[in-house]
């Protein structure tokens, strides 16, 4: 992960934020990849409220002339309080420097609803499938954008990451 940390540090993300996020990495998580003219933060393996907030913080602190785009899906297996956890993440999104929020999944709609309450200028869109999301992103992404892909493994956002890296 040292090359990823170096890349993030060059973009003037505080070292404390880098260390905090690196401590949560393992195996298939948090790959930072240069794709064409944008940066992809592929963290599509798993999601919890804390891990999504940590990833959003890293995205928010990236120094870029482009947009900061969060592509999120449902957090699965959170039990009966799942809607509230999704709302909590939505409220957190409103406090970040994320410019665009794109989601898949029914519970993820809470992200948009809550984020809009505090930040109505946030550009958002909900997609009914990963295929629809991929088709949109392939034409939407521009030079210098930074894109975070984060969601529970069962939502299969890895499919989105792989398509963007192709």
What are these regions (language model features)?
Residues 1-5, 9:
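Single conserved hydrophobic/aromatic residue that forms the stacking wall/gate
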Residues 10-41:
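Gly/charged, well-structured mid-domain segments that form the phosphate/adenylate-handling core
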Residues 26, 44-119:
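Active-site beta-alpha connecting loops in nucleotide-dependent enzymes
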Residues 28-31, 154, 158-160:
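ATP-dependent carboxylate/acyl-activation modules
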Residues 40, 70-71, 147:
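Residue-level marker for buried hydrophobic side chains located in beta-strands
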Residues 123-133:
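Short acidic-hydrophobic, aromatic-tinged amphipathic segments that line or gate anion-handling sites
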Residues 134-140:
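Short amphipathic alpha-helix with an adjacent loop that forms part of the alpha/beta core around
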């Amino acid at each position: 992960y040292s090359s990823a940390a170096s890349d993030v540090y060059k973009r003037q993300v505080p070292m404390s934020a880098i260390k905090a996020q690196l401590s949560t990495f393992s195996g298939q998580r948090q790959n930072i990849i240069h794709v064409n003219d944008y940066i992809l933060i592929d963290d599509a393996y798993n999601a919890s409220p804390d891990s999504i907030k940590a990833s959003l913080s890293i995205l928010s602190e990236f120094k870029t002339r482009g947009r900061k785009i969060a592509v999120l899906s449902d957090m699965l297996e959170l039990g009966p309080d799942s809607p509230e956890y999704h709302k909590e993440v939505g409220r957190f999104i409103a406090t970040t420097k994320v410019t665009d929020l794109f989601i898949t999944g029914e519970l993820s709609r809470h992200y948009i609803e809550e984020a809009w309450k505090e930040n109505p200028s946030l550009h958002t869109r909900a997609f009914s499938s990963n295929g629809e999301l991929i088709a949109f992103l392939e034409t939407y992404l521009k030079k210098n954008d930074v894109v975070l892909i984060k969601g529970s493994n069962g939502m299969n956002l890895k499919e989105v990451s792989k398509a963007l890296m192709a």
